[in-house]
Amino acid sequence: MKNPKKKTKKISKKTRKAMEAAAARRVKISKKTLLNIAAVLCGIVLVVGICIGVHVIKKRRADRTVKVAFYGLSEDMCAMLKEKIPQEENIILEFDVISENAFDAGLVKDKYDMLFTWRGQITDSLQASAEDIPQRVLETMPTALRNKKCVPILLDHCELAYYTKTLKDTGLEIPATFKEYQAFLNAAKSKVFSPYFCNGAEDRIMIDFIGALVMAQGGLKAYNKLIDELRINNSLDAVLDVKLDEKKCTLRSILDMLKNWPKEGITHPSWYNGRGNDLLFFAEDAQLGSFFTLLSEHRKIPYNVIKNYESAMFPVNVSPANYGLIAPALSGMLLSDNSNAKRYIANFFTEETQTEFSDKTNLAPVHSRAQAYDRQADDVRFWAASCAGGAVPDLYLAAYQRRPEELKKLCGEIRSYVR
């Protein structure tokens, strides 16, 4: 049976024309809409372009002024650093030396593009908001020294200096561990009046020596723990029994050891009252087996005296992975994204500039290939580069850079404890 044919409805000419007209109108509307959209997009692009252009122009104008701050540096150091920031056409340079009692972290962050100071409590307070140091700058120095927020320029060092004759007389090498240093001290008792000495009356030397002993006994973790405690406490009693590591390292254990040293003949009975002239007198008279000081202070000792002493890193009983060299670092920070400041920071890290800086200050350069002032400065760079923790600030800079009265009080309490 055949299917019936489907009936097709005929469309009249009039209807067809109406449909074609409607379709044409729809096409016209679509084209118009597209043109409108295109016009709007072009407008947006134009506005964005204008905004970007205005921003670029404003930034260029803003970057023309480079504001540089110095804090806690000697006049000579400030002048040395200024020389490496060139006066260029259309660039306005503003230099400020911030006085000891006028440092305000918030104000400094908002006002300046660059800051030069010693790494420590102050730089830590600004680190979170600081700009990254350009990678090309960091690549000039050993990996362990690369700090992208606070880049080291020169290194000082908390050192032990050994009387070479005492080393020879005892038949011992420079100690590699703190246990070996204790053996040296005991062996030196029959050779010199005071196997150990330091300028204990000077607050910075006193607190730095305590820090070196904590690093020697408990390592970097214990050292950092002590820094945290000293920053929030103002008395010796508050930190005396805080456990600094997983073992038995406390400030009390360190001070008890020092309290016994004079009784054991290891140091002068009043070492904690020693001053610069005392150390110099004993060293010149060949009465010291070793002494603790900063490299920068070592440089002030006359050559005819210091030539008889061999500088070394403070020996430790911890693994290399838990150790940082206590080496105060003259450092630079970028506090804004000023493009000219980012250019200028690179000027401090050429091989020639680093060699010049080391010669002028007698401190250690950080550039891998720069010539150091002498073997002592070269050793400091090598030791810092070889430590897992790199160069770390001394306790003075880490906890008391802006708290001299609190430091004076604490050191007075330490002297009372060990006497």
Predicted regions located by residue number:
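Conserved N-terminal structural module of periplasmic/extracytoplasmic solute-binding proteins
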Residues: 3-121
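Hinge/lid segment of periplasmic solute-binding proteins
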Residues: 116-162
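A ligand-binding cleft/hinge motif common to bilobed small-molecule-binding domains
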Residues: 119-127, 292-309
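Periplasmic solute-binding protein
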Residues: 142-176, 200-234, 326-333
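Glycine-centered hinge/linker elements that transmit conformational signals in sensory
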Residues: 224-272
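C-terminal capping/gating helix-and-loop segments adjacent to ligand/active sites or protein-protein/ligand interfaces
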Residues: 326, 355-419
